[in-house]
Amino acid sequence: MKTVYAFLADGMEEVEALMVIDLLRRTKKLNVVTVSIKDELLVKSSHNIKLYADKNINEIDFSSGDCIFLPGGMPGTTNLGACEKLADEIVEYNNQGKLLAAICAAPTVFSNLGLLKDKNATSYPSFEDQMECNNYGGGVVRD
């Protein structure tokens, strides 16, 4: 069974996180693990909803994962982007050709790491100026 690591940071958009996590878990074909980027499992959303991650970033074996998923929201996206360990692993996943997925503002994390320069990508429209990619736009982009 493939493993998706869904990263949670304080200030994330809870609908973007929980909707994706819920839908992926309902397939019963994926092992979806929610991961806090801090030592504490408790994560507060942008609307102060408290969620408990399954694990923290130091408890997972990145090599056993198949996908990294980042929900958007602010300041959640900023917090995800500031997590050096996560950034290093995103680059490694990209180098290995593993799946990277993000929604809303979170694709900017990939852009800031220089991973979208030759890719088609999209984001929440107000973040377009932060997206350094080959071709911008569209509701859903896979590249």
PLM features: what roles do these ranges have?
Residues 3-6, 12, 28-36, 54-143:
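Active-site-adjacent pocket-lining segments in enzyme domains
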Residues 12-17, 42:
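Short N-terminal binding/cap micro-motifs at the start of the first secondary-structure element
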Residues 19-20, 89:
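Hydrophobic residues within alpha-helices
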Residues 21-24, 125:
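Generic helix-packing signal
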Residues 35-54:
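N-terminal beta-loop-helix "entrance" segment that forms/cooperates
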